[in-house]
Amino acid sequence: MGKLFGTDGVRGIANRDLTPELAYQLGRIGAYVLNKDNNKRAKVAIGKDTRISGDLLESAMTAGFLSMGVDVISLGVLPTPAVAYLTRHLKADFGVVISASHNPAEYNGIKFFNREGYKLPDEVEEQIEAYILNNRDVDIRMEGKDVGTVTVDEKSIEEYTDFLKTTLDRDFKGLKIAVDAGNGAAYRSAPKLLKELGAEVILINDTPDGMNINKGCGSTNPEVIGALVKEVGADIGISFDGDADRLIAVDENGEVVDGDHIMAICGICLKKQGKLKNDVIVGTVMSNIGLEIAMKEYGCNVVKTKVGDRYVLEEMVQGGYCLGGEQSGHVIFLDYNTTGDGLLTAIQLIATMKAENKKLSELAKVMTSYPQVLVNAKVKNENKEVYQNDAIIMQSITAIENKLAGEGRVLIRPSGTEPLVRVMLEGKNQEELNVLATDLAKLIEQRLN
């Protein structure tokens, strides 16, 4: 992970950290690095979420691409996974998403996809970064007919939702589905898809104003969709983050069904159908112990990676697996798309409900979660990795592990995108975990600041 590119592209406060000048350079240098071995005129597909700064950054980045002779297809406001799909579908040479996912509205981000719709490997990001950090430009300025042009894809949402429908063998008639669009990228595509599948849709937080993305809504605020489900008597509630690459669901009682539960439910269904490749689900070190226990009962294994959907995806591609994801709701169905896809995950989960003819609360019983506590310690970016060298912090971690006595675990993880060290404890006693995690986070803040 470099200085510009984090675990999920370049991210920062728009117009301060992520400036139009930087976006322009990312367009120019990105075009050069990604297209230098290609002898034909390239094209790039660009999509964005609903942030106010999306237009600013898209305009600047587009100018960079055009100056390099790259044609731009502007997809408009669209989920991140839709851009991954449309990059392939439209035969673009690469794709770009302008979004900061679950971060507050003042943040934004830029990430690239290759022509297959996969995030770029670290070494390619490092090449782009090296040019920009060393203030090196490339000696290419297209002129006349060689300057790039922009076309707007007016049917981008339709192309994406039509594709999603091809992944199903049933409709959703008779279901009432509550949707929290998080004032983000799925605010049009989610209701369109679900209505076309025959469901009754109750929709909230579908009026983005550029500043209300993720604000008191969406997948990081599941209590909002939970309350709506109970109020309207829905069969299921689904809640998206800002760029709709993740999903949190709630059952008919308003109880949260997180990414681990979704993978268990869909994984067991795929196993029964003989479609779970190698009988493996790919999770992360943050995946609940309960997921492993549930999958073992059905003769399946959970392979764990570092946190981050890019690492889950790498493992899936290398191992030939079809289902993987994170507790946070990033779930990848690799038979259909190359990235976490909130809408795809939602319809696969709902299709499983229909196939099994069971309520979501019933399906969710396949997995029992151990209590997990996550506390963030605020630590300067440059100090995030130093905790391993601090003897007092390491002694405290060992003491907690001894206390949990093999029936729990401690996981310390520096954030890839924010100045935080995440402290996660898992075990049987929620109250004990709360105290231990809070004390450890405080110690980390004291020692590392």
From Swiss-Prot:
The record's section on SUPFAM superfamilies has: Phosphoglucomutase, C-terminal domain, Phosphoglucomutase, first 3 domains
Name the Gene Ontology molecular function terms of this record: magnesium ion binding; phosphoglucosamine mutase activity; phosphomannomutase activity
Fetch the PANTHER family from UniProt.
PHOSPHOGLUCOMUTASE (ALPHA-D-GLUCOSE-1,6-BISPHOSPHATE-DEPENDENT) (PTHR42946:SF1), PHOSPHOHEXOSE MUTASE (PTHR42946)
Pfam families the UniProt entry points to: PGM_PMM_I, PGM_PMM_II, PGM_PMM_III, PGM_PMM_IV
Residues with the Phosphoserine modification: S101
For this chain's record, the cofactor binding note is:
Binds 1 Mg(2+) ion per subunit.
* Listed GO CC annotations: cytosol
Highest taxon in the source lineage: Bacteria
Q: Where are the active-site residues found?
A: S101 (phosphoserine intermediate)
Any one GO biological process: carbohydrate metabolic process
UniProt organism field: Alkaliphilus oremlandii (strain OhILAs) (Clostridium oremlandii (strain OhILAs))
The Swiss-Prot or TrEMBL record describes its family as follows: Belongs to the phosphohexose mutase family.
Q: Which UniProt keywords apply?
A: Isomerase, Magnesium, Metal-binding, Phosphoprotein
Q: What is this protein called?
A: Phosphoglucosamine mutase
Keyword check for Metal-binding, yes or no.
Answer: yes
Q: Which cofactor does it need?
A: Mg(2+)
Q: What class of enzyme is it?
A: isomerase
| EC number(s) per entry | 5.4.2.10
Q: How is it modified after translation?
A: Activated by phosphorylation.
Substrates-to-products reaction catalysed: alpha-D-glucosamine 1-phosphate = D-glucosamine 6-phosphate
Query: Which sites bind Mg(2+)?
Result: S101, D241, D243, D245
Q: Its function?
A: Catalyzes the conversion of glucosamine-6-phosphate to glucosamine-1-phosphate.
Instruction: Output the InterPro entries linked to this UniProt entry.
Output: A-D-PHexomutase_a/b/a-I (IPR005844), A-D-PHexomutase_a/b/a-I/II/III (IPR016055), A-D-PHexomutase_a/b/a-II (IPR005845), A-D-PHexomutase_a/b/a-III (IPR005846), A-D-PHexomutase_C (IPR005843), A-D-PHexomutase_C_sf (IPR036900), A-D-PHexomutase_CS (IPR016066), Alpha-D-phosphohexomutase_SF (IPR005841)
Task: Determine if Isomerase is one of this entry's keywords.
Answer: yes
